[in-house]
Amino acid sequence: MNDFLVFSEEVAQAKAEKKPIVALESTIISHGMPYPENVQTAKDVERIIRDRGAVPATIAIFNEKIKIGLTEGELEQLGTSHDVEKVSRRDLPYVVAMKKHGATTVAGTMICAEMAGIRVFATGGIGGVHRGAEQTMDISADLQELARTNVAVVCAGAKSILDLGLTLEYLETHGVPVIGYQTDVLPAFYSRTSPFRVDYRLDSAKEIAQFLETKWKLGLNGGVVIANPVPKEEELEESYITAIIEQALKEAEKQHITGKSVTPFLLDRVKTLTGGKSLQANIALVKNNAALAADLARELS
């Protein structure tokens, strides 16, 4: 057993009883949404997973330990503190060794989930290749993690502030399958559609579970992107959100915002420019992904 892992009572019991478990990231709480919506969404997502017969395991770093499953107090702390680090692969040893509090990104959560023996993870959207990456080389560590870590990631596609075409090219190069759940095209986070096709369409959690079992039994390491479109009633029109993202990107460039700060800045500007509609879509798609992830975890267990 990894000395750095600490399981909540609920998750430890689920592991002992071989119950289905769904990993959840924590940067969505610390950096992805404003308070109090962030903490409320985290609680709602955990409830949805429980209601569908699985056990939620929100992951974060506290006091030199990787916590697999958080208390309500810890969720609150992540949602209100201003000194929580974003933790991806490179940051994990620093945050643990220096006894800092950390919220795990998609990549960070995948690493910790695999350490904990959890194979299904629900999030909002994965990171990817940023627009203008030909010059900046700004490519999310999430993509490398998907190529090497055996965790299935249920998401609403890549965040639409990214270059979706190049993100798909990168995933293809690294052998990461992109499955569309009941869709032939890649959802673009806030929108159900984009100009890009997924690799394979599968229409049930059972089919996706069969795909995953086969991939890993073949000894093919790496994750899978399971792209689940935002619910129709909450989606934002593709052309509408694209124009707003373009404006936010120009503002980020003008203000010389780079690196880790780009995504939180863009999400915040998009929220303001849509009058809060993007936040509502974000909350809806995270809940939708949690439901599918719970169904998938049940099929795999």
UniProtKB/Swiss-Prot annotation:
Gene3D superfamilies: Indigoidine synthase domain. Its cofactor is Mn(2+). Disulfide bonds: none annotated. Binds 1 Mn(2+) ion per subunit. Substrate binds at residues 86, 106, 140-142. Mn(2+) binds at residue 138. It comes from the Bacteria. The active site is at 25 (proton donor), 159 (nucleophile). GO terms for cellular component: cytoplasm. Its EC number is 4.2.1.70. InterPro entries: Indigdn_synthA-like, PsuG. Homotrimer. Catalyzes the reversible cleavage of pseudouridine 5'-phosphate (PsiMP) to ribose 5-phosphate and uracil. Functions biologically in the cleavage direction, as part of a pseudouridine degradation pathway. This is Pseudouridine-5'-phosphate glycosidase. The gene is psuG.
